Structure formats: structure tokens, C-alpha cells
Amino acid sequence: MQKNTPLILLAGLTPAQFMKRHWQKKPLLIRQAIPGMKPLIDRSTLLDMVESEEVESRHIVRKGEKWTLKKGPISRKSLPSLKTPDWTVLIQGVDLHNDAVHALLQQFRFVPDARLDDLMISYATEGGGVGPHFDSYDVFLLQAHGQRKWRIGRQKKFELQEGVPLKILKAFKPEAEFVLNPGDMLYLPPGYAHDGTAVGECMTYSIGFKVPRSAELASELLMGLSEEMTENAGTSLDVIYQDPSQTAAIKDAGIPAALQKFASQAVAKALKDPQILNCLLGETLTEPKPSVWFDPPDQDDLSAFAWPCGVRLDRRTKMLFDAKHIFVNGESFRAAGRDAKLLQKLANEKYLTAKEASGLSEAAAQLMKAWWEEGWWHPSDLIENGMT
């Protein structure tokens, strides 16, 4: 994405200007970020998704000061009447299930893919919402249908109400209020308190971002490192502890200092190689969510497959890269030269033309076929200068 091109999506700011002035710093209200905005998925189809085990959904109802929360899958018939006020359905990761929603999410790739998470859709009847709260991540709130009133404010106190199934602030003090119409969008940095209430029936699209926590990320990397070390067991990299200078024990149960040092050195050695850690990070960042399943080609497609062909990534595929590796759906592959350039292009643009794909080496072509058999990409009739 061109970082210095002004975007209507960002109120005429360039991506570079937005990131410098607003990202993780201050809110931005954008009127008509998407002119003529209409829902990309109809209400009936959206509400049907609450019954799917492949979709993360929540049903929230407010009755006065009382809140109830049900997590999906739930029966569509159990939802209140559309004329009943004060209820909301939240559908997470709709971009994984709908091409149009997935295409909309791609407009926010001025933020690195490693940080872009998903698009959640909130459907609400009159008065519906989830109460005043704050998120630990950046969020764009795009109004797709109807109106929603937003109250926002910086919080000094983040105490939550007790006995409530939602994380609702105990003492919310709004500083500003906006009513968003279809096409309007509000950006909020992490920790900025907000309370959205439906004005009549409405749909709001929330574009959210990943915020790795240091402890959680370290835990995942160390788990991967443990598997890496297990694979090295018994090889030349697996040094055996030796203590020819060990004296006779005076304190029988005392741990020898030399053994403590050996353990410390073993861990330090494992953490010392940045390539291993970078590889594990890429695998972690591209790991599909537990609910994600791919659709491998059927037998007829397998028989008809011909390479080279146009390549279009499946909307559920996560693909990143660094200087030496390509990461796809939790797996890592070394790539160099022309292969690296073409696979990086695939990660950036989500497609390759047949002519471009023909430039891959035989080894890379075999890898592409294996990915296709997993359902990670689909053959496509792409012309040389773009997509048909």
C-alpha cells in the first residue's frame, strides 16, 4: 500500500500521516470514510452465523442494570424479536467467512499484516450495546447500517463493575459524543473508553488489531523453542553435562553450582540464535485460529491441476515473511533469490499471475502444489497486469 497517498478512508490523511499523528495516540472521527456504505452481508445471513461452530459469536442483552451474555453457537430461534430493544449479537472474524468483508479488511493494510487481526460485526436493536468499556487494542468502528451513538473519553480509573458477565467500567466519564451514520468511522487507540448505543436497528463493523503481550508471546516462543530443542536431542548440538572436577559432596542435597551454570548456559544458547526466534515468531503470528478450517480440492480438481497457473490466496490464509523466510499458516520455509521475491509478492498482494508463478523454481513449484492441496490457495485466471 502506498503510504503517502491521501485516503478518503482516513479523512484525506495519508497512511504515513495517520500513523504518525493518530495511531496509538489519539482518536479520529472520519465522516464518510466509505461514501455510500451499505452492509456487505445481510441481516439474516449474519444472524444465521450464530449457529455455526466455526464462528465465534456472543449474544448480549441488557435489562435495566442487568446484563446477560450467551456464547455461541446458539439457536437462531432463541434470539429475541427484531422489535425487542436492548440486545446485541457480536460475530467475530466475519472476514474469514465472506469475500466482500475480507476485501474491506484489506483496506486497512497500511498497518502491518502482523498486527491486523479481524473484522467483527455488531448487530443491535434499539438501545443495544455492550456498555462502557475499553479495549487493549486499536480499533476502527465503521458504521455499516443505521446509526450508533458513541460516547468516548480518556479514563483514569479502570475499575470494572462486579457481578457482570461483561467488562463494563464502573465510573465512565465521557468527554465527547458522536452519532455515526452509514459510512462514518471512528478510530480509537488502546485504552480509550467508549460506549456505543444503537439508535434504532444498526450494524457496526469493528476492525481490530493484534496486541501480543510480552508474557504470552514469550510463553508461545519458548514452547516452540522447546520443540526445536527436542528435535535436536541426541545430535551434535545436544551437549552432555560433564563434571570431572566435581568434589565429594559435603551437603548431599545441594545443587552443584556447575550444574546451575550448565543449565543457564543451555537456555542462553537456545535463546542466542535470532534466526530460530525470528522463525518461531513468524510461525506464531501466522498460526490460524482454532476455528479455522481449510477446504482441500476435490478429486476432480486434483486430476485437472496444471502448473503454472494464476494463484489467489484463500481468504483464511495468513502469510508473512522476513529477510530469509516465508511463513504460511503456522509453518516456515526458507526462500532466497527469485523465489523469495515472488513469494513475498504473493504475501503482499495475495495473488500471482500465471506468468509470475512460472518464474518459481521447481522446488518452490512443488511447495506451491503442496499448499494448494491443503486448500491454502486457489487457481485463478489472473492476467499479467492484474486480476480479471
Task: Name each model-derived stretch.
Residues 1-21, 34-184, 192-240:
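Active-site region of the double-stranded beta-helix
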Residues 10, 17, 25, 332-388:
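Long, charge-rich, low-complexity alpha-helical segments
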Residues 27, 189-190:
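Proline-centered helix-kink/hinge sites
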Residues 190, 207-209, 356, 381:
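Active-site proximal loops enriched in glycine and acidic residues that flank catalytic Cys/His/Asp
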Residues 222-301:
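C-terminal amphipathic alpha-helical segment
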Residues 267-346, 369, 380-388:
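Acidic, low-complexity/disordered tracts enriched in E/D and polar residues
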